[in-house]
């Protein structure tokens, strides 16, 4: 049995989970609604305020899909009830971020400002001018947008300049030593 897959998912109050015969799962909650098509071989059942994921056999593919499906469902339930967020920090002289409507505009030392559009279901918040908070109900989208923003200026190892996640630790290098 998959260690992750065998754990049932508790459905919090205010969240409803429905599964169609084609394994399309709809999760509705206070923050919104998520719909995802799961693999047809995995069995998903909603039993008294919890979701149970089972697999038909011990074939390698089914074992892999068992834990994956359970993790995806759990992320959907957590997303519609609490939401997900990633915090990015801009480190560097003149590095700033500002919001223009739903668009994030950043000055990152290029000859032009960098603009990032908010994807559906993802919002930006600013904490000062050097902290960007990416929020949403879909963990995959939040992570992808945050990674896209970080890719504009990855942190460099000498001065730590660039865009980093707030919980990321940058391995620093020693500079050249003079004679």
Swiss-Prot record:
Question: Which InterPro entries does the entry mention?
Answer: Ribosomal_uL6-like (IPR000702), Ribosomal_uL6-like_a/b-dom_sf (IPR036789), Ribosomal_uL6_a/b-dom (IPR020040), Ribosomal_uL6_bac-type (IPR019906), Ribosomal_uL6_CS (IPR002358)
* Cellular component GO terms, alphabetical: cytosolic large ribosomal subunit
Ordered alphabetically, the record's keywords are: Ribonucleoprotein, Ribosomal protein, RNA-binding, rRNA-binding
Give the SUPFAM superfamilies listed for this entry: Ribosomal protein L6 (SSF56053)
**Known partners and oligomeric status:** Part of the 50S ribosomal subunit.
Sum up the protein's function in the record's words.
This protein binds to the 23S rRNA, and is important in its secondary structure. It is located near the subunit interface in the base of the L7/L12 stalk, and near the tRNA binding site of the peptidyltransferase center.
**By its UniProt entry, which NCBIfam families does this protein fall under?**
L6_bact
Q: Which family is this protein grouped under? A: Belongs to the universal ribosomal protein uL6 family.
Name of this protein: Large ribosomal subunit protein uL6
